[in-house]
């Protein structure tokens, strides 16, 4: 159970129990204790004390308001609104109470209602800056950053030393690319609030974002000097040290954070990442395992652990059994909900980590069978048998299916489909010159490596990952062209506490033309992996399918594409046979081109298996030049020369269904600024 959720439940139980207690403490004492907890961001302790104060004095309006602030801080917006309603009955016409209701409506996705509240406050209180802050948030949510800048400037014009206005303008100006203005606002904030650690924290953040690590380190150390228990400052310092390749110092800061609070999974993550950079792989694995025991749902940490385990540990390593078990349990949960696609992925992931896990392989085989892939089902059971782990039931099943499938194409042509190399496309994967990462350092690189690992199971794509460097377009294109990639992709990835978003842009490896791009946004559980799987699916489906002739008997040929490649019974697709080595990618868009003179004949599909198909050929012209190794290509994937002059760039956006309001990372930063 989530740690914060446990705390929340305990507080609710406390509220219910103390409601009828006759031993309530002095309301003022409890209220003051609540304020102390709130100032230290101990929201649950504050809620407990404010609730106690209200037991002693049910008409304590300020306690209701403070209670609402705490519920707002832990995203319990409905409870916050309930307490604001109680506060407003006891405290009349106070704008901060009204404004907080507006912010709660933003959290609930009721943007129009929030807008009305902030405008009503400004009508009665034209100089109220919090209402301006609310309107600024609404502008950011609607993608109007310049509109937010205007509201923050209005607030600053009314209070020219307001800390939140100055810091907000610095962040917004930086987002707009106006770095001179951003630094000017930060310098003003440092001038007027020189003793405030939060100001130095954001000053350090902007310095790092603009590439000035030395200045960022100086400022964040000042923040720590001003407030020695400011954990987010220690985290940023550790991030700076990591980015500066000072891994030993980074580890020391992480160790210090852990001594203060062993439940800080972010400290375990970065400690593991720095250890990996020092080639201390066992240490990294140990730290990440500890971090995942604290937060099992940290997908990026789990991905980093699995990627390192695949690279560093032996297949027989007993720890792989434990790492695979996580995915097996998730798969079982999905099966209970009849989510077969998700269950299949989790079993595949378990087998990627531990190929020897019989439970996962049998379950995966059963899913293949339910989808009608009997040959694939049999191959999975034969794998178990080859490892010497087959039970008598499995051996009997293998015998039965060998008899049942005795007339398949693989038997007729004596070719084992398990060993077919159907990789058609060479794809380069690069990380963009990304944004400053606040939660997981190297999150983009880990995402890129994970995408590459997902492509391992692809039938048609050979993915080549370069996650050690960051690239702009020019550098990525030069590298892709040098290595002869058909296409190359550049990943841009961003995460916040609750969301991930990303974009993959795909370009021609021959000429650098943008051929397609995909945007994704996810929130909720499994958002990281879900977003990356979306990218992989889109890239796979965008690339044309074509086959290779495996064998020939007179006019009959065997081709290495089948049901798993999208062929269906009674296939009516027009196929052409093209000379081996004669095809190339289209000049513009995604497609295949070749010379008319390289067309050797035509192909008609007659029998379709899971991995292969067979049919008859007819030759073009007088001479039969069709040989094993030549290509068969669907006519609809061919890009005529005249179409290659048209721009076929495609852009798609995917938003998760459980999303109410998309909240940019910028907004998360702005909300963290205290008034």
State where each predicted segment sits.
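TPR-adjacent "capping" and linker segments in tetratricopeptide-repeat scaffold/adaptor proteins
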Residues: 22-29, 311-326, 416-421
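Structural marker of alpha-solenoid helical repeat scaffolds
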Residues: 56, 90-91, 124-125, 158, ...
């Amino acid at each position: 159970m989530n740690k914060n959720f446990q705390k929340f439940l305990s507080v609710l139980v406390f509220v219910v129990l103390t409601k009828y207690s006759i031993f309530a403490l002095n309301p003022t004492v409890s209220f003051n204790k609540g304020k102390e907890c709130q100032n230290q961001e101990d929201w649950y302790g504050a809620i407990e004390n404010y609730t106690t104060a209200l037991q002693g004095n049910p008409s304590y309006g300020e306690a209701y308001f403070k209670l609402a602030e705490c519920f707002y801080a832990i995203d319990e917006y409905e409870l916050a609104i309930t307490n604001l309603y109680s506060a407003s009955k006891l405290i009349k016409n106070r704008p901060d109470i009204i404004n907080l209701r507006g912010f709660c409506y933003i959290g609930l996705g009721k943007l129009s209602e929030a807008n009305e509240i902030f405008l009503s406050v400004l009508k009665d209180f034209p100089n109220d800056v919090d209402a301006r802050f609310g309107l600024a948030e609404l502008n950011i949510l609607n993608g109007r950053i310049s509109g937010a800048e205007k509201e923050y400037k209005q607030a600053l014009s009314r209070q020219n030393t307001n800390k939140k206005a100055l810091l907000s303008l610095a962040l917004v100006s930086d987002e707009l690319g106006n770095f001179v203005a951003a630094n000017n606002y930060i310098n003003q904030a440092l001038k007027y609030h020189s003793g405030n650690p939060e100001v130095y924290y954001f000053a350090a953040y902007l310095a790092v974002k603009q590439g000035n690590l030395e200045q960022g380190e100086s400022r964040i150390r000042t923040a720590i000097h001003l407030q020695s228990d400011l954990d987010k400052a220690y985290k940023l310092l550790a991030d700076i040290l990591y980015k500066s390749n000072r891994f030993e110092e980074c580890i020391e800061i992480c160790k210090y954070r852990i001594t203060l609070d062993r439940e800080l999974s972010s400290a375990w993550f970065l400690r593991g990442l720095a250890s990996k950079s020092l080639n201390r792989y066992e240490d990294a694995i140990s730290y990440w395992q500890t971090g995942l025991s604290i937060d099992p749902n940290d997908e990026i940490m789990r991905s980093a652990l699995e990627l390192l385990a695949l690279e560093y540990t032996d297949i027989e390593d007993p720890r792989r059994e434990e790492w695979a078990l996580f995915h097996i349990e998730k798969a079982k949960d999905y099966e209970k909900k009849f989510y077969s696609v998700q269950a299949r992925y989790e079993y595949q992931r378990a087998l990627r980590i531990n190929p020897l896990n019989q439970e996962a392989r049998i379950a995966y085989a059963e899913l293949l069978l339910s989808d009608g892939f009997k040959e694939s089902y049999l191959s999975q059971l034969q794998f178990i048998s080859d490892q010497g782990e087959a039970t008598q039931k499995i051996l009997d099943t293998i015998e039965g299916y060998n008899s049942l499938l005795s007339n398949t194409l693989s038997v007729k042509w004596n070719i084992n489909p398990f060993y077919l190399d159907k990789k058609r496309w060479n794809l380069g994967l690069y990380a963009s010159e990304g944004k400053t990462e606040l939660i997981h350092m190297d999150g983009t690189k880990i995402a890129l490596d994970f995408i590459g690992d997902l492509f391992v199971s692809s039938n048609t794509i050979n993915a080549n990952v370069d996650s050690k460097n960051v690239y702009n377009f020019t550098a990525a294109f030069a590298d892709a062209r040098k290595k002869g990639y058909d296409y190359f992709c550049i990943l841009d990835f961003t995460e916040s506490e609750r969301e991930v978003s990303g974009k993959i842009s795909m370009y021609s490896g021959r000429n650098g033309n943008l051929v397609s791009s995909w945007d994704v946004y996810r929130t909720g559980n499994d958002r990281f992996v879900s977003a990356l799987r979306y990218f992989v699916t889109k890239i796979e489906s965008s690339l044309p399918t074509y086959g290779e002739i495996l064998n020939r008997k007179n006019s009959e040929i065997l081709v290495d594409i089948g049901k798993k490649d999208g062929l269906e019974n009674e296939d009516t697709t027009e196929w052409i046979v093209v000379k081996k080595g004669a095809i190339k990618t289209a000049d513009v868009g995604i497609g295949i081109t070749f010379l008319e003179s390289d067309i050797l004949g035509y192909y008609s599909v007659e029998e379709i298996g899971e991995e292969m198909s067979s049919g008859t050929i007819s030759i073009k012209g007088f001479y039969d030049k069709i040989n094993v190794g030549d290509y068969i290509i669907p006519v609809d994937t061919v890009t005529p020369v005249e179409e290659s002059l048209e721009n076929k760039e495609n852009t798609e956006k995917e938003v998760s269904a459980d999303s109410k309001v998309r909240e940019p990372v910028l907004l998360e930063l702005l909300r963290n600024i205290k008034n």
